[in-house]
């Protein structure tokens, strides 16, 4: 399957499921089960209920998807960015 065949949609996480999966309500009203992409896992990008996300789906199974981007929200909190020593 070529990468051009993927559908990219916007949605909001509405449920956290076991095994690193999430329930995502898409902007078109459909609800899917999505998992976190490998790069997001590698860099420990965490997602919580209410986060806006971008999901890639294959046209062959419109009930499952992969979360490839989490929209940034303002305010990192006090202290700024923490660096590893």
Swiss-Prot record:
Keywords on record: Cytoplasm, Initiation factor, Protein biosynthesis, RNA-binding, rRNA-binding
> What GO cellular component is one of the record's annotations?
cytosol
A Pfam family of the record is eIF-1a
For the S1-like domain, which residue ranges apply?
A: 1-72
Which molecular function GO terms apply here?
ribosome binding; rRNA binding; translation initiation factor activity
- SUPFAM superfamilies the UniProt entry points to: Nucleic acid-binding proteins
Note the InterPro entries from the entry: NA-bd_OB-fold, RNA-binding_domain_S1_IF1, TIF_IF1
Give yes or no: UniProt keyword Magnesium: no
Gene3D superfamilies, per the entry:
Nucleic acid-binding proteins
Indicate where this protein resides in the cell.
Cytoplasm
Which first-to-last residue range defines the signal peptide? none
Q: What does this protein do?
A: One of the essential components for the initiation of protein synthesis. Stabilizes the binding of IF-2 and IF-3 on the 30S subunit to which N-formylmethionyl-tRNA(fMet) subsequently binds. Helps modulate mRNA selection, yielding the 30S pre-initiation complex (PIC). Upon addition of the 50S ribosomal subunit IF-1, IF-2 and IF-3 are released leaving the mature 70S translation initiation complex.
Q: How does it assemble?
A: Component of the 30S ribosomal translation pre-initiation complex which assembles on the 30S ribosome in the order IF-2 and IF-3, IF-1 and N-formylmethionyl-tRNA(fMet); mRNA recruitment can occur at any time during PIC assembly.
Family (UniProt): Belongs to the IF-1 family.
Q: What is this protein called?
A: Translation initiation factor IF-1 2
Give the organism the record lists: Novosphingobium aromaticivorans (strain ATCC 700278 / DSM 12444 / CCUG 56034 / CIP 105152 / NBRC 16084 / F199)
Gene that encodes it: infA2
């Amino acid at each position: 399957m070529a990468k051009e065949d993927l559908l990219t949609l916007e949605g909001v996480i509405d449920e956290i499921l076991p095994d690193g999966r999430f329930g995502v309500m898409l902007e078109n009203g459909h609800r899917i089960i999505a998992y976190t992409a490998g790069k997001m896992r590698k860099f420990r990008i965490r997602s919580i209920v209410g986060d806006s996300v971008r999901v890639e789906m294959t046209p062959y199974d419109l009930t499952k998807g992969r979360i490839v981007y989490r929209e940034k929200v303002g305010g990192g909190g006090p202290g700024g960015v923490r660096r590893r020593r």
